[in-house]
Structure formats: structure tokens, C-alpha cells
Amino acid sequence: MARTRNRLDRTPFQTAVTDLSHDGRGVARRDGEGGKVTFISGALPGELVRAEPTARSRHFDEAKTVEVLEASPQRVTPRCPHFGVCAGCVLQHLEESQQIVAKQRVLMDNLERIGHVTPQAVLPALTGDNWGYRRKGRFSVRRVEKKDKTLVGFRELDPRFVADLSICYTVIPQIGEKIPLFAALIEGMDGKRDIPQIEFIAGDDAVALTIRHMQPLSERDRQAWVAFAQEHGFAIFLQPGGVDSVHPLWPQDVPLSFRLPQWEVELAFRPLDFIQVNASLNQKMIAHAVALLEAKPDDRVLDLFCGLGNFTLPLARVVREVVGVEGDAGLVARAKENAQRNGLDNAQFHAADLTQDQRSAPWMRQGFDKLLLDPPRSGALEVLQQLPLKTFDRIVYVSCHPGSLARDAGYLVNDQGFTLVCAGAMDMFPHTAHVESIAVFERR
């Protein structure tokens, strides 16, 4: 006889919320469950809520708030009508000034719990634009036959579903206010079932959409996108396959770039390239990192995971030489072009997979005074274990994941004898639980 899985009891329960998790959910311990931890979406520390169970596991349960019985004084009314359904933002119900406080707390907790390190000083949080800041992103697209409509938006909190967005306030207004127009255009296409996603990216002077399509577009559909682009001021790219298949539909020549006025630098990029999503925070972050590095005119600096040269080229304005290393060969090619375009002949770039053995690479043996790195979520442990770390007087580590930063900080401090001078959060993604941070290490 086949075993049947126990059905989840969704009876709402009342509980006190004591903390905020790293992903922005309230944390509660249910006495009736032996003190088992429950993560509750939409709940804040200090609140008494009624919550409905949504999932159970051996070590913790999950639930969603159905009623706030006693509200936190830090609770605010979310601006977005889709809050609580869309997973794009999970902290809109928390006062903006407290969001970054929570992120600082997540960072410090990770450093202590995972890395077993404590910074000598906590840096003041870095903040930028809180609304309309997101200049790069990806919308999912889904034709829902039962609703007889096309949905365009971010994923819902239940990632099986696409949020049916009417607006998004965190995305730049040129995009966030036009989401229903995207859905209407796709709904009218011959190939409306063949569009799985739309990517958007904005430079200082142009906004580009990349349309992923699983089947060739009909001429009628192509002309519909061209007309849409002309009416609303977009550049349209098509992506029938992998990244290399991206090509312009209209216009044929689209200059995409952003400027860093403090450094007299302009960075050109392509539609699917990585750029920092928050333009105002990015400019502050670069200035912050350069200052924390204490870069001097005679310094030679190594910039790992350099991308388009976001840090490399500003550094080239203030140091003798800077070498950028990046795993994406396309980004390296663009970085070299950017250096040439900006008249910076003291910036070199190399393509290298920094998760693999690079000890014989020529750039590894050049000799540097300082190190700046901005790795992906997985961190930089593999390359840190290969570098001649004792040659660096100072390291500035920009992180997009506090857990991997904490692990790498533990290695630098506890295994390699560095001091964690300071660390602090940076609010690259306001209203989300994403924690961007920066840390400074000094050789003892």
C-alpha cells in the first residue's frame, strides 16, 4: 500500500516575532512546536501576528502573515500594490532608515557566526536612490491560458508563478511604468507563447530591451516591436539563442554607456553585460572604495573580478598602474576598449577564470601594493588561496553576499594574519533583502 504524505495543516496561529532573517522574513519560535523556528513573510520584529503555515521541514517551518495584531512602530504602508505577492521587494513594509540597519546587522552577524571575525570599526552605511533606481533587470513572461492573458513581471514569492505587475517603483520609471504595455504588446503577437523573458538595461542616454524568443519572430511581430520602440524611446535587441545570439532589431547602432563624472570616465557596455544596478549608489561606492584603499600615486593595484572596469578605470586616474582580471572574455574586451576610449594607458586587463589555478599566470607575478576585489555571490576563496597575500598592504573587498564575505574574511584574518579594519553595508538594492557590503583588511 502506497504511503500518503501528511497534508500541511494551514490553520492560522498567533505568535510573537523576535527577529528578522537574512532574507527579510520575521523569525518566531512556536512554543507549541517545541520552540521550532518559523520564518514568516510580511512580519517584523516586535510584532504579534496571525500567520498561516505554508511549508514544513525538519528544522524550521515557513508561514505568511494574514493579520498584524500588534504592529511594530517601524512598520509602514508599502508603496507597491503588489507587495506581499511579488518577490522583487520584501522589505517595503519596513521604514527605509531601518532597512539598512537590518542589513548592517545581517552583515555583522555573518562575520561573527561564519568567519569568527569582528571588524575594529563599523562603517556608516552607504545609501543612494531608494526608488526608481534599478537600471538593469529581467522580467519573466508567461502566457496563462486559464486567464487568457500574458503576465510580465518578477517571480512571485512562490517562484512557480509570475507576478502580474501593473507597475514597479524600484525599476527606473521608463521601464516600471510601462510593464502593462509590454504585456499588451506580447499578448497581441503571433508568437505570444514564445517569449519567456525580457531583459532591460539603461545607460545615461539610452534604454535597451532584449527580447528572448524561442521561435523566429514573424515580420508582423518584428514590426510591432519596432513601432513600440519608436513610440516609447527604447532600443530593441533580439535573443533567439545564447548570449552570442543577441543582435539589434532597432536601431542598428545603439551607444550604451554610463559616465562617472568624478573620475572623467565613461564606460560603454552591451545589452546583457553586468553593470551595477543602482547608478547613484555605484558612484558613491567607487569613491568609497578608492578612499578606503588609500590609493597613492605610486601604487600598483590589482583589481579582481573587474568586469567592464567599474573600479579599474577610476583607479587608473589616481595610481601608477592598475591590472584588472575578469573571467568573462567579452567584458575584458569591453574593458580594454573603455580604457583606450578614456585615454588610460596605465590600465591593463586579462581574461582568467579566477576559480581555477592561476598561479602561473603572468599577472599573478607582477607585484602589487594593494588589492581590490568585487567577486560574485560565491566569493573569492579560490583565488585568495593562490595570491601572494603578504605583498598586499591593504585589501578592499566589495561583496554581494555576506556569507561568502564572512568565509573569506575568516581566511584572511584567522589563516593569513590580516586585520579586519572595518566593514559596512551598502544599500545597492533598497526594499529588498539583498546585502551589498564593503570590508577593509590590513596586513599586520
From Swiss-Prot:
Keywords, comma-separated and alphabetical = 4Fe-4S, Iron, Iron-sulfur, Metal-binding, Methyltransferase, rRNA processing, S-adenosyl-L-methionine, Transferase
Residues binding [4Fe-4S] cluster, per UniProt: 80, 86, 89, 168
The record ties this protein, via InterPro entries, to: 23S_rRNA_MeTrfase_RlmD, MeTrfase_TrmA_AS, MeTrfase_TrmA_CS, NA-bd_OB-fold, SAM-dependent_MTases_sf, TRAM_dom, U5_MeTrfase_fam
Which residues does the annotation say bind S-adenosyl-L-methionine? 276, 305, 310, 326, 353, 374
- Provide an example Pfam family for this protein: tRNA_U5-meth_tr
Coiled-coil annotation reads none
Give one GO term, molecular function aspect. Answer: RNA binding
Enzyme nomenclature, EC number: 2.1.1.190
Instruction: Note the SUPFAM superfamilies from the entry.
Output: Nucleic acid-binding proteins, S-adenosyl-L-methionine-dependent methyltransferases
Q: Active-site residues?
A: 400
Q: Can you give the residue ranges of the TRAM domain?
A: 5-67
Q: Which reaction does it catalyse?
A: uridine(1939) in 23S rRNA + S-adenosyl-L-methionine = 5-methyluridine(1939) in 23S rRNA + S-adenosyl-L-homocysteine + H(+)
Q: Name one GO biological process term.
A: rRNA base methylation
Q: Which domain of life is it from?
A: Bacteria
Matching Gene3D superfamilies: 2.40.50.1070, Nucleic acid-binding proteins, Vaccinia Virus protein VP39
PANTHER family registered for this protein in UniProt: 23S RRNA (URACIL(1939)-C(5))-METHYLTRANSFERASE RLMD, RNA M5U METHYLTRANSFERASE
Q: NCBIfam families from the xrefs?
A: PRK13168.1 (NF009639), rumA (TIGR00479)
Function, in words:
Catalyzes the formation of 5-methyl-uridine at position 1939 (m5U1939) in 23S rRNA.
Its family remark reads: Belongs to the class I-like SAM-binding methyltransferase superfamily. RNA M5U methyltransferase family. RlmD subfamily.
Descriptive protein name:
23S rRNA (uracil(1939)-C(5))-methyltransferase RlmD
The scientific name of the source species is Xanthomonas euvesicatoria pv. vesicatoria (strain 85-10) (Xanthomonas campestris pv. vesicatoria)
